[in-house]
């Protein structure tokens, strides 16, 4: 692989929906590659069959496509260093482990589960951290050959140096060193011949020419072992970028197991994909310089200004109110046509009678923060809810149930006039305004009761004339007449 070109990879496990933290890793990995005009690789790490969820690979594909994180190499489109599904690469890992054995950097371990359990129990009883005691580390070569020939089960362990320190540099956390004596002789190949996650990761990253590894800070403690593997093979160590955890609050990590929202959950609630990605990017990262005060970024803008130097060491708190605010801003920036297209599925959940959707959307868009909250605002269109006439009392509009009846009776002939065009909201509003002037009243005195009569609610997506135009003449007259009857009690 060309050594001067940035190559990054997103390597998810197909275990279900896309966690917010995973999606942030995918985004940062994508931005790192694209900012440097490099290559973004998708690799599926499916070796843990116990956690594999049917259909989860499609969730990964669909989520990345939906969010615009399109990969340059991957399982479906191929590339020069495939296959890009880890389970399809199984044959190569054992030979790399055996190479380390031949060079004296790894060894066959024949310890049984029972021995290891007894060892760890003893260590715990003595107040020690559990660790492997190196029982098979220096077995005579002849004994190893005999035990292998006899078909005795084994794992392959890496020989971690017993003395000295192993250090590494991280873009976010700086230089970190760990005493070698604190590290276990990690398993590289399990008894079933499958590689461990750490080993497969290092081998695959090297063979795929990965230059920058971006992952969660929970992997910081494993990184010295990764480095020892790179050194054992004589391979170039990639640039490490570890990201802080995404927290629900000061004490708890965001976790789908605890019912916290996945990307799919947020979209299902009516958050826009672009808004979610914008917010996720700001979870633990902030732009510098002239962009420091900016909060709304397109993916193209993020590619342009991306720098891993903006990643914080501090845990990022997932703030639902901040996400709402960003989502509301994205909704406001949509064209009326785009908003209607996105809002219609939500409108159709609640409204099954003919209405003027264009006018409804014009009223919804400035007020809407999350699309999923649209249906609950529209329940009065299909059926008039039962309401108390006390709703007609409004100090600001100087209305009472008595004045409301007077206002509705004054509006009835106007709204009944066949020449009044209900498809033109401004025409209807101006006619009502003229009627208010004729009566010597303010607009609200006349139109506030109309809104109550048509909806049975104080808060609606639009005032009285807007609701009348959305519903049309027939429904409007039926509801106004019913309201007058109710007020006559």
What kind of region is each of these model predictions?
Residues 102, 107-242, 248-254, 262:
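Active-site cores that bind ATP or allylic diphosphates and position pyrophosphate for catalysis
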Residues 20, 266-274, 313-319, 352-360, ...:
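Structural motif
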Residues 34-46, 199-212, 233-247, 460-466, ...:
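Glycine-rich phosphate/pyrophosphate-binding loops
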